Amino acid sequence: VLKLENGENVPSLEQFLKVAKKKTRLKLILELKVYDNPEWETKSIEYILATVKKLKLQRRMEYITFSWYSVQEFIRLAPKGTSVYYLNGDIPPEKLKEAGCTGPDYHIGVFRSHPDWIDKCHELGMKVNVWTVDQPHDMKWFIEKKADFITTDDPVVLQQLMK
C-alpha cells in the first residue's frame, strides 16, 4: 500500500479488485498507461492478467490503452475473447480487427474526423466506444450513429436523450 502525504492509502491492484469483486454488477475497465519501455508493459500485463485470474475476474474485465504495443500484448497473453480496446485514435478499423482488437475507444474528435469508421467497425463485428461526449448535440449524433458505448461527464443528460 502506498501512503500519500495527506495520509490516504492508495490500494494495490489486488486490494482494489478484491473490493470491486463484491460489486457483482460492475463491469471492470482497466487502463494501462504507456511506458517508455515495452518490456515494462509486457511485465505489467503479465502481472495484471495473473492478478485478475487469481481473483477469478476474467469475465468481468476489459482493458484499454493508448499503447498499440500493449494492445497486441493483451491480445496475445489474455484468454481468448478478452475485450481489448485501443485509445489512441490513429489506427483504422481494418487494422484493429486484423490485430484481434475488440474495437476502438477513440476521442470524439477522431470519430468526427472519420464518421465512416463507426459503421465500418460495426460491419467488421467490433464494438465502438467514444469519449468524452458532453454536449447534447454530440450525444445525439453518436446515438444516431449507434456507438456502442458513450463516455460522458454528464450521464443524466445522455440517459434522457437515449429514451
List where the protein language model places each region.
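Metal-dependent phosphodiesterase/phospholipase catalytic core, i.e.
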Residues: 1-82, 102, 124
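C-terminal active-site rim and adjoining tail of enzyme catalytic domains
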Residues: 5-8, 85-163
